[in-house]
Amino acid sequence: MDIEFYNKLNQALHGDAGKIDRVMRFRYLNEFVKPGQILFAGSSLMEQFPIQEFIADFDLPLTIYNRGVGGFTTSEMLACMQDCVYALRPAYIFINIGT
C-alpha cells in the first residue's frame, strides 16, 4: 500500500473509512480499465444509478464504469479526481455530485 497516498486520501475524506475503501478499490480496478469508455462518477445518485437497466435499454458498444461514492461532497470528489475520473480516460462522463 502507498502510505503517502493513503494519508492524503484519509485527510481529504476526513477519515471516512467507507469512502477511503471505495476509492482504494477504484485505484486498484483502474489498472484493468479500457480507456475511451463511459464513466458515471459522483455521489450516491451515481453509485446507485441502475447501470444494468441503462445497458439493457441501449445497445452500447462501450463499457460503462461506475466510480460513484455515496456521500461524496464536491470537495471530496475534486480531491479524488485522479482515481475516480482521470485514470479511466473516458470518452463520455456523467457526473452528479452533492454539496
What does each model-found stretch correspond to?
Residues 47-55, 59-65, 75-99:
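Oxyanion-hole/transition-state-stabilizing segment in secreted/luminal serine hydrolases
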Residues 71-72:
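Histidine-bearing beta->alpha loop at or near hydrolase active sites
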